[in-house]
Regions:
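Extended catalytic-interface subdomain
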Residues: 143-145
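RNA-binding accessory domains that recognize and position tRNA/RNA substrates
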Residues: 1-139, 148, 154-327
Length: 327
């Protein structure tokens, strides 16, 4: 039987009871697979790796070594949440790497989107490789592979969930407890494992993080404005009950300035663009109609609370022709 093929008889996980049954099965399977050996996991804080981490902690405890690399392009509070949930609440064997300076120094002056993506991906591999090399006795690699990953690669998973490991990075085997699950099932399992809703229901987030929303060459001050404006948007959408109604939303701070005025003086500050979309397949997206009072409140907060910003815009572009992300 192909271990990468979901059995036709496998019931869709839609309830806490089905999730608990799945968790029990996977705990037994993982214990049988790894025995008393150590397992390594790159923990991004995303849905898939977080659910795998929580499940493996339940199965093998301190035998799991989680490595979280903060590349400086995370949303506000995300790395702190990983430390709080996994390092403190779940008492995980967590290795936290703050590589912010390393990544931002590499990205300095780089404006071309694909080049930025490549630098971020390659640097992640180097950091993960260096830190993993310091660990002893690692026998298995765990990954947050899910079933759509397998389907999209015609049943042959490239296993690049940790950024693309070098060919000479040898393990006895891969531990992929959620590889036959769809995304909605992974979320149900995550909730059954007790992970916080904001982590389990996390929106899609590009691999390069905020690097593709801070368009052009990334600067620390503009990245700060992006992170703060994004946090305000999320907070206000949450208060308005929009978080569960909109598929994805975020802010963008482009590499341009706009003329503003304050205390009678001209300013050359950045614009902030609000992007919100609804979609079923991510191929065709519509832009939701947001209540004017909500947009006005978000605008006022961003202009008053975020340094260096003088203008807020709402992106009305559907896909196609515009992509969801700006880069």
């Amino acid at each position: 039987m192909d271990s990468n093929k979901r059995p036709d008889t496998m019931e869709r996980i839609t309830t806490p009871e089905l999730a608990e049954s799945f968790i029990a099965e996977q705990i037994a399977a993982v214990r049988e697979q790894v025995g008393d050996k150590k397992v390594l996991l790159a923990l991004s804080g995303g849905v898939d790796s977080s659910v795998v981490a929580a499940l493996l902690i339940k199965a093998i405890g301190k035998q799991l070594v989680c490595v979280h690399v903060n590349h400086g392009l995370m949303r506000k509070g995300e790395s702190e949440q990983v430390i709080e949930v996994f390092g403190k609440e779940l008492d995980a064997n967590l290795v936290y790497i703050d590589a912010t300076d390393r990544f931002l120094d590499k990205l300095a002056g780089v404006a071309e989107p694909e080049k930025k993506r490549k630098i971020i991906g390659e640097e992640f591999v180097r950091v993960f490789e260096e830190e993993s090399g310091k660990l002893e006795g690692i026998s298995f690699l765990a990954q947050g592979t899910i079933y759509p990953d397998i389907l999209e690669s015609d049943g042959v998973k490239a296993h690049h969930n940790v950024g693309g490991l070098p060919e000479d990075f040898k393990f006895e085997g891969l531990v992929e407890p959620v590889k036959l699950l769809y995304k909605d099932e992974v979320r149900v399992v995550g909730k059954a494992l007790g992970l916080p809703a904001e982590m389990v229901d996390r929106q899609p987030f590009p691999g390069p993080g905020l690097g593709v929303r801070c368009t052009g060459a990334i600067t620390r001050d503009r990245l700060h404005a992006l992170r703060e404006s994004d946090a305000i948007l999320r907070e206000e959408f949450d208060k308005a009950g929009l978080t569960s109604q909109i598929w994805q939303f975020f802010t963008v701070v482009p590499d341009i300035t706009s003329t503003g005025v304050k205390d009678g003086k001209r300013l050359d500050y950045w614009p902030v663009i609000i992007r919100a979309v609804n979609t079923v397949d991510a191929m065709h997206c519509t832009v939701p109609r947001i209540d004017w009072e909500i947009l006005e409140k978000i605008t006022n907060r961003i202009l008053n609370e975020v340094d260096g910003v003088c203008r807020v815009c709402y992106d009305m572009s559907p896909k196609p022709i515009a992509t969801i992300e700006w880069e």
